[in-house]
Amino acid sequence: AFEMYSHCLDIYPQGAATLYEIAKFYMFLNQPDKGERALKEAVAADPNNYWYNQTLAAYYQNKGEAAKAIYVYEDMVSHFPKRLEPLMSLVDLYNRTKDYQQVINTLNRLEERDGKSEAISMEKFRMYLAMDNDEQAFTEIENLAKEYPYDMRYLTILGDVYMNNGKEEEAYSIFQKVLKEEPGYAPAMLSMATYYEKKGEDSLYQAQLDSILLNDRVESNTKMNIMRQLILRSEQTDKDSIKI
């Protein structure tokens, strides 16, 4: 088959399909340089073929050549506006190279093409935190909490963001709202414990932890983690951990 494809290229060197197939042969024969060259020629011969472009981009990505992979995927975004996969690959690549602003830019492009989603908003929230851009992180999680007002996860995260940025009373109000809606919601209960700890209210902090440990709705793994934290806290303050 290899000889047949080689003969076809002798007759018509610009045959994109033939170049693509022979590129795969070169890769199989562990001749990556020749395979890469044939792949690039296949893309040049038929730039509108999605799979030729995808194979070349994936080759660069697997080889660890992020810049080259990004270049191909960015070109694919322009050539194939209805395909979301190139944008998703770019999110991953920009993440790996720690180019967080480009991650956000790419997520915005995903939103423009596919609409707003929880996953995109949460990823943007994480990126803003990684960039120490607390104001934008606030905005992103606030919008998400407004869009999903009955999802206790986002309200609790919003409360945590408030608390970590000096807005303790706003955080307290949110945690109380969550626990009124869902009394046994462990993340909000833990956040309340953290709130009391930050305020220096040790008795309320301890009482909150006790309520978590005694709550049947809280998973055993969460309780075990709390026990570990209590033991560590006890040891650090020279108390007898056996009392716990």
Describe these PLM feature segments.
Residues 28-29, 62-63, 96-97, 130-131, ...:
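Register position in tetratricopeptide repeats
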